[in-house]
C-alpha cells in the first residue's frame, strides 16, 4: 500500500530552515521536525519575555543562576508548546506523542528542562532519548531541540491510541520517562542508558565486571584491548 506524505506548516511558527515543514503526516502518524526555539523574527529565543504563548509559571531558581536557567526554561517551554500546537491542529495533544528525541547542548542543566517537561507532559511522558550534541542551532544560542513521532489523530486507523506499557520486569531508567508505549499494533521503546539497577545508586555500567558472565564474550584478560573495548562491549 502506498501512503501519501502531507507536509504541515504551522502559522506563526518560524521555519528553522526555509521550505522545511514543521511536520509531515502519513499512514496515521505525525513525524515532527526538530523544534529549534525561535522568535517570530527568526532569531533564537533566550528568555520568557520573548514567548508568544503563555510563559511557564515562575518558580524559585535552583542552584543555577538566572542567566543560565532562564534560556533553558524558556526554550524547553517553546519546544513543547509548538509540538502541542501541531498536534492540536490535528485534533490531538501531547498525549499522542509516541517517541521523542531531546537534543541538548549542556546536559548538566537537564533538571531545568525536566521541570518544564513535567508540567507539559504530566505523569506519563513518552519514551524518549536525551542526546548530548555539540550544537542545536546555527547561531549556537539554542540549548535544546526536540523532535518526535506522534499519532495523527485525523487519520489514525486504529481504535486504541497511546497506552503506557506497565511491566515491572522492564529495566529501570535514570529519569522519569515511560519505558514503552503501545499504539494500535505498534510499540515504541525509550532509549536505554546502561545502568546497573542492582547496585546502590544505579551506577553506570563501565566494564565487563558490571555485567553477567554471558555478556563478557569479548573479554580476553587484563589487557589494553579490554581497557579500550570493555566499556563499549559491556554497555
Could you tell me what each predicted segment is?
Residues 1-81, 85-234:
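N-terminal presequence-like segments and the immediate start of the first folded domain
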